[in-house]
A protein has these predicted regions:
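Short alpha-helical DNA-recognition segment
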Residues: 17-36
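A short, Lys/Arg-rich alpha-helix, primarily the initiator
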Residues: 1-19, 61, 65
Length: 92
């Protein structure tokens, strides 16, 4: 698996010359909040995914999947205790 791009890097392409301030106002969020997403400093929340999907005529699930892929990639690289599989005794 590779290091998936932050959804904010993809969102930048949707701005199409619009200012961050203009898009933030349109989304109903602050400019710093949008800047954090665009710069990869903040995650895409469900609320943000809905706002983006409505503004750019995309699916909220698309944005959430991008975020989930990135989250899983980072989580898979963290050290954590091994988890043993649960016994699956269906004969009982």
């Amino acid at each position: 698996m590779y290091n998936p791009a932050h959804p904010g890097r993809i969102l930048v392409n949707y701005l199409q010359g619009r200012s961050v301030t203009e898009v933030a106002r349109h989304l109903g969020i602050t400019r710093p909040a949008l800047s954090r997403v665009l710069n990869g400093k903040a995650r895409i929340s469900a609320d943000m995914a809905l706002r983006i999907s409505e503004a750019f005529n995309t699916d909220a699930e698309f944005w959430l999947r991008l975020q989930a892929q990135r989250d899983l990639w980072f989580a898979s690289r963290k050290r954590r205790a091994k988890v043993k599989p649960l016994a699956q005794d269906l004969a009982a």
